[in-house]
C-alpha cells in the first residue's frame, strides 16, 4: 500500500466544487472515478480543501492510498491520459502513510481577478469578474493591512458554515494591477466559507470610495456579517498554492 500525493490544476466552470455531492458533478468524484478505473480499486481521494462551484485551482493538492504497481512518480502521466480536458495532474509523488492533504497543510494562497472595465469579457469570461466602476487601487491596498494578522473573521463568513472557530491568520494580502485587471492575492492559514469573496466584495466598496480603508478595521472588529460587502461571483477565484 502506498500513499500518493497529487497536484491538480482544474477549471471549475463545469463542476459543483471539489467535494462529492449527490446528483451533481464534482472534481473529487471525477478524479476518484478515473483513478479507480486505472487501479481497479475503490479509491477515496482526500482533498486539501473544499472549493465552491465555479472556483478554479492552479495547484490543488490531494492524496489517495493504493496498491497499484504504477510508480507514484509516474502516476500523473497515466492519469492525464484519461482525465477530461478541464482537469490535469501536474505532479504525483509518494508521501508517508500518515500524510493528509487537508490536515497537514499549513496555509493556502488564493487569487481573485477583477476585470475593471465597462465591457464584459469574452475570452476570460469564466475566470474574471467584470466590474465597470473605476477602482481606486491605492485605497484598496491601504485597506488590506487591516485584515493582516490573526482575527475573528466572522464578518467575512457566509451563514451555513459549521466551524468551531472563526479565528484565522492572514499572512499576506496584496493588490496587483495588470492593465485593466485588478488581482487580489491573499495567503492565510485557512479561510472561512466565502471569506475571500466577501473580503473582495468589501474591498470593492473601498475602491469605489463608498467606505474608507479604516472602515475595514471597524468591519473586522464588529464580527457582524451585515457590515461587510457582498459575496462576489465564484468564477474570479482561484486556488494558487497550498503550503506544507
From Swiss-Prot:
It is an enzyme of class 5 (isomerase). CDD domains: PseudoU_synth_EcTruA. It catalyses: uridine(38/39/40) in tRNA = pseudouridine(38/39/40) in tRNA. The active site is at residue 52. Substrate binds at residue 110. Its EC number is 5.4.99.12. GO terms for biological process: tRNA pseudouridine synthesis. Signal peptide: none annotated. GO terms for molecular function: RNA binding; tRNA pseudouridine(38-40) synthase activity. Keywords: Isomerase, tRNA processing. Belongs to the tRNA pseudouridine synthase TruA family. Homodimer. HAMAP family: TruA. Formation of pseudouridine at positions 38, 39 and 40 in the anticodon stem and loop of transfer RNAs. This is tRNA pseudouridine synthase A. The gene is truA.
Amino acid at each position: 500500500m502506498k500513499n500518493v500525493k497529487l497536484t491538480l490544476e482544474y477549471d471549475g466552470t463545469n463542476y459543483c466544487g471539489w467535494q462529492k455531492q449527490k446528483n451533481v458533478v464534482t472534481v473529487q468524484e471525477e478524479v476518484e472515478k478515473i483513478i479507480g478505473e486505472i487501479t481497479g480499486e475503490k479509491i477515496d481521494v482526500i482533498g486539501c480543501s473544499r472549493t465552491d462551484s465555479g472556483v478554479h485551482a492552479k495547484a490543488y493538492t490531494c492524496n489517495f492510498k493504493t496498491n497499484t504497481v504504477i510508480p507514484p512518480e509516474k502516476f500523473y502521466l497515466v492519469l492525464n491520459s484519461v482525465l477530461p480536458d478541464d482537469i490535469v495532474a501536474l505532479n504525483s509523488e509518494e508521501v508517508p502513510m500518515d500524510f493528509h492533504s487537508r490536515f497537514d497543510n499549513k496555509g493556502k494562497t488564493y487569487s481573485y481577478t477583477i476585470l475593471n472595465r465597462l465591457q464584459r469579457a469574452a475570452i476570460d469570461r469564466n475566470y474574471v469578474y467584470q466590474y465597470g466602476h473605476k477602482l481606486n487601487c491605492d485605497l484598496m491596498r491601504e485597506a488590506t493591512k487591516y485584515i493582516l494578522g490573526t482575527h475573528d473573521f466572522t464578518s467575512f463568513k457566509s451563514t451555513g458554515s459549521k466551524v468551531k472557530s472563526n479565528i484565522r491568520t492572514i499572512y499576506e494580502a496584496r493588490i496587483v494591477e495588470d492593465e485593466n485587471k485588478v488581482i487580489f492575492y491573499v495567503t492565510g492559514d485557512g479561510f472561512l466559507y466565502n471569506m475571500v469573496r466577501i473580503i473582495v466584495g468589501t474591498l470593492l466598496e473601498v475602491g469605489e470610495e463608498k467606505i474608507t480603508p479604516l472602515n475595514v478595521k471597524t468591519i473586522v472588529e464588529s464580527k457582524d456579517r451585515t457590515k461587510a460587502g457582498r459575496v462576489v461571483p465564484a468564477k474570479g477565484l482561484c486556488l494558487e498554492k497550498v503550503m506544507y
